């Protein structure tokens, strides 16, 4: 038995679902569910951090108590009452002595003692509070990082565990966005935010308790406002959570488009779809912008109501409080004194204000909960076919007896279309069974069922008599080798790609498999041999080479079951002959299932099964089926008649078949060795390339990668906060109104302090009626200030939020537009992989909004409070003002130091996250290949390595976060101590009135306090500055390709003339020093068909890419009507080119939209034009038979067969009515019947058009007006088919050998 593989994520394994548990995929998660992946120790430490935060919050009521006692004693000792108010806290520090009928001198000395005690008490409290908050935030952040680290790993693991059916039907599976934006939001909500919220809420709770202890009557009156504040806050939080989910959904849909476009960037360029994609992306951002504005409106209204209630409550408190004080004024054992009024008022009001300050943090928690909803729904979803599950049987021996029994099946994304209808096929051990039939009949479906990508809805698939559903999924797939029609290679070395077939394979095993797959020679001729990087999706090598590496990967696996789905479709004749022999040799041991359109490759099969309409129409050996004279015989007869005609014509034109057969092995060996010395990438329609694989193979490779990373280290422009704000300049109207509102709101705090000082001054008046009248006036003023604060806060929040979301939408659109406006070389850069670009686009724009929008209003409000407070302070006492401001440099210095530190560590964290995203996105994008090769654990291991680096960088980032926030909270109270200590001395020396020192202190301390609240957003600002630098660098970048404006010199008509390659030299930007074309000269006359042939790597696809201007020549030129292609506007040039590539990319649009995509220069492509193009490509009948017809949506992993996708791609090219048609193996994926019809359609389409064709199957180009044979990047032979056959050299040899093998 195979040993159970140990989990490589022990820290995540403790959090898997229990066996047999059932999870609702639509379950709603509470905030507490966000901590489900914390350990017991972490939960204990989190509780400790919250208790520590609670202890820290107790110091705010403590400050209110000593402040109330001190201010009350100031009044008593200045007025000279009979007996001063009792004190409980100040005596601990040497003050608060209760005097009776004291002299003026005694009172003044007592004031100095009280001031000293207050200063000492403030210092002790500030230090204690600073230490406690630092500890609480540091603990919470570390715990949050641990959990996010686990959730990242678990999320990828959950994605890798999902069945293919989920990928087919999932509309929001954009991986890069979830791994960056959603997890960042989750981290925000489970880290310091929860500590800050608890700190602010417990300040309120403990303040209420203190207030009740000192004066329950007044406390009850003041508390009357609290239910309204709590109600407003809770309603806003609930609305915020609901809207946050909608906002995330909108951004998720937009991120899907980004990932899809970047993955198919060459297709977008070929059909000039940039504007259409920008429009699609922009439309998907509109709901997010509208939702964001609503969030701002609701938040503003809630905050406004809270502030209005707070000021109304203060007005009521001082009015009622004075009544209580005056009633007991002359009593020796009075309860209500100015001290009690201050303690109750400040304890309750500051607590209520803290509830208001908690609002944005509560919003972050609501957003985190919404983000957790999307993440946990995936993590908790039980996969129907889990490739990483240890359950299931693992037989010791595998004979390879396969039986498909009564199979009924329909794809999950197309439940109305039944593909297999009761199919039964028996495959004996060691047999080679071939499946043939029209495109879409279910051949490839059987291959997928064999791998358990899907389970049949009826019937069963059995291996050695065991239902596949009873076998361990990983074990089953480890027994199978697969070579698909469109093989996927990963962005690592050639050697590593082959080793993925069997991780334990030695270098000798790899080379043996490569020789069998006929790719060893071209690999060893590369400068780095098996260490050559293939690029993302194998973009750096040709299609034929990619397929041979995939074959080597399957062969090194030494499988018991071999699945070949058009395994040689991308090979040239020479390679095909050799690889076919290798495959036949490899298939002698294992049971082999073959899907083939070329019947010549399956005549030796032990059994041939002809499928039609989802059932077996015929089965038997080649000879048996020919004798039966049924469907198979008819298909073979058509093929033989076609090939006989072509062979006869070839023999007449050139040389006998036998001679070709005898010479082929010798001559083509030399040709291939010569021509594969320098390799070219194929004409890809997929993404870019990068330099990272799933795992490092040697220490030397890791050292090389480190050197390369150091060399290519990202240098980000430095951006000031002013430059950051300039990004928001188009929204200046909102910012101006919001700025005025922020200043208005900020000014209310020092104004309140000013009148609060007057209130204390009034208390010294001996006439009770005067006191009552003046206090009533001040109460009314407080109501006015409340209205001013409420209106200012609402406008501030709404205007800045609107400015922020509008800016974010604009930045996302501009960044997306800038990226797709780059040249292909930009996407070839390893730093610009699909995963990295998606991650960058999502996080950078989000980060910039994180420091703009509503947070700018909060910071501007804090500055306004401080400035107005300073003005008030200098008016009343410049000495006390200067001394009070001594703490501000400490606060500002802490922000500066944190900023410098965060900028460095955030850059490292960003780079590490991008690398991790690259690994993950590549795996998820190619999930079928990952599943087929059982690479899930390897992907996870590599991702874990990258995430560990992210974790280190993030821990450095938060190291000083607690210190800075704690300093922002503690510094204002230290400032209180300093200010009131010095103010008390000034009062004792009769240099200042006691009410004035209260005015100065309140005005300034509120400014300092507001600055402390603004410090909660310091990390957002630092992240935003870093992201803004990256965005500005991006915006400055322009394509290196010239794109001249339209002129009479480069008209559309000019692009329709002769095409001339004039002494063209070219090497790919990512492979400098490896020339592909070396002085190529080629003329393509207008309205003629020219075919480029030659073995893989000879430069054929490069010629096409230069014509499409994916790249420009290094030397020489490509001319159209005598005008160099670089003189044409890109859109003008590409508008007349119709491309059908070897591996077509279709987008997540309807079939009609995909076909109409061929003509992006018009918005009014009619349905009639679409249908006509579909008919020409022989796909109309298939589309019409679908339940939704042309409105059928093609998802990311649509269940169309290769032939169906190819025909839609052909329709897409034809709908634009191109003057130049480019066919790169356009019929390679079609069955014989479809190929014949489509070839006729292409022949008709070529009429009156210039046509450039690339083909390995030379029979498809024999009617071309000119055939050019390329070798080492130059044309070595050219002429018509007959002329080249008569020449009796390379082309004749290739052609006749293909006829013999066919």
Curated annotation (Swiss-Prot):
Entry's localization field = Membrane
Give the Basic residues compositional bias ranges: 697-711
Record flagged with keyword Ribosomal protein: no
Q: What domain of life does the native source organism fall in?
A: Eukaryota
| InterPro entries assigned | AAA+_ATPase (IPR003593), ABC1_TM_dom (IPR011527), ABC1_TM_sf (IPR036640), ABC_transporter-like_ATP-bd (IPR003439), ABC_transporter-like_CS (IPR017871), P-loop_NTPase (IPR027417), Type_1_exporter (IPR039421)
Say where the protein is mainly found.
membrane
Q: What is its EC number?
A: 7.6.2.2
- Substrates-to-products reaction catalysed: ATP + H2O + xenobioticSide 1 = ADP + phosphate + xenobioticSide 2
GO terms (BP aspect): germ cell migration; renal tubular secretion; response to hypoxia; response to insecticide; response to toxic substance; transmembrane transport; xenobiotic transmembrane transport; xenobiotic transport
Q: Where is the composition biased (Acidic residues)?
A: 664-682
Cellular component per GO? ATP-binding cassette (ABC) transporter complex; membrane; plasma membrane
- Per its UniProt record, what SMART domains does this chain match? AAA
Q: Which UniProt keywords apply?
A: ATP-binding, Glycoprotein, Membrane, Nucleotide-binding, Repeat, Translocase, Transmembrane, Transmembrane helix, Transport
Transmembrane regions listed in the UniProt entry: 47-67, 117-145, 193-213, 221-240, 301-322, 340-360, 735-756, 780-801, 856-876, 878-897, 960-980, 997-1017
> ABC transmembrane type-1 domain spans which residues?
46-367, 735-1023
* Primary enzyme class: translocase
Q: Which residues bind ATP 2?
A: 1094-1101
Pfam families to which the protein is assigned, alphabetical: ABC_membrane (PF00664), ABC_tran (PF00005)
Q: Which residues are glycosylated?
A: 101
Topology term for the membrane: Multi-pass membrane protein
Which residue ranges does the entry give as Cytoplasmic-facing topology?
1-46, 361-734, 1018-1302
Binding-site residues for ATP 1, renumbered to this chain: 437-444
Region feature (Disordered): 644-714
- PANTHER family per UniProt: ATP-DEPENDENT PERMEASE MDL1, MITOCHONDRIAL, ATP-DEPENDENT TRANSLOCASE ABCB1-LIKE
Family the UniProt entry places it in:
Belongs to the ABC transporter superfamily. ABCB family. Multidrug resistance exporter (TC 3.A.1.201) subfamily.
| Name of the protein in question | Multidrug resistance protein homolog 49
The organism's taxonomic lineage, starting at the top: Eukaryota, Metazoa, Ecdysozoa, Arthropoda, Hexapoda
